[in-house]
Amino acid sequence: MKKILFLIPNLAHGGAERVLVNLANNLDRCKYDVTVQTLFDVGVNRQYLQPHVRYIPGAKKQFRGNTMLMKVFSPERLYRYIVREKYDILVSYLEGPTSRILAGCHDAGVKKAAWIHIELPTPKQAAIGFRTPKEALRLYDTYDRLVAVAASVRQVFTDALPVHTPIDVLYNTNETEKITALAKQEPDDPMFPNGGIRICSVAKLMPTKGYDRLLNAHKRLLDEGLMHSIYIIGIGEEQKPLESQAVKLGVEKSFHMIGFRDNPYQYVSRCDLYVCSSRREGFSTAVTEALIVGTPVVSTDCSGARELLGEHDEYGLIVENSEEGIYQGMKRMLSDPALLAHYKQQAALRGKRFSREQTVQAVERMLDSL
């Protein structure tokens, strides 16, 4: 049995954190002894780890400037301080500090892999968590395998940082059966009333998610008489700025930020449309989940969108990555009920491709090949 360590900054409410929990829970427990370790013991996704997955918590509180502080120390010193046990395979599951930390392991026979979840288009961005792009290139080349969550993520990364380490493309693991079952539960939520056209999006409230653009598109569509309500499921730093923007636009009664929900699927499955307004993505977990529950999708042309929705909009509508693109895509869907019905069928069809079994088996093949 191989001992595997997955190292990640925390298990907060983001997509990468959620799919790590899904993956750790579903790896073959007869083949792998799985440990998940965090740098900081925070995040709602901790509770979803199954009992057979060992969890090693980090510091109790996450503090500002921690990434800069870790750059002061060498990877070797950080590794010796943070990782106290011996493993057969070390996995950094998020680009950044954890990739630098695990690069400090030089033990004979230990294999290393690192995941890249988002587009990192410049050398500086590709070197996030490292002192310099030169250091990042040197340390990434100590890994046995890198993993990108989409082909476009791999291409952007290698353009920015020409590593020699092989890079596999492995899609995120989703609990498809669990998602489908949870989607059938009826939400009892006064913040989510029945009636009218309902549009949703699920994400951390942060600038890269583009909700400021979605708000402006929402206002324009309402002014044209295309009535609908938008529900944003998530929390984050942009909540107050978005609330202020909604009030300024006069749409605070139709643009609802309902916060974090343990079961977002019961909301997404009952919405007429899912919108990904992101400026930048990796391989959107939330869009994947929308497809699994059969909700039509409009997405900006960001990383992973074409792998999810098709090169020619076969399974969803991909639009220009701009406020105008979001507006035009939503307008097209809201103006054409037949098109919306078509993409509802196509979403359910596409969702079947991202089954838990297929994605887990692909990761296991990669681990076994190291």
Regions found by a protein language model. Give the residues of each.
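A conserved mid-protein helix/loop that constitutes part of the nucleotide-sugar donor-binding site
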Residues: E17-N22, I197-R220, L226, E237-E243
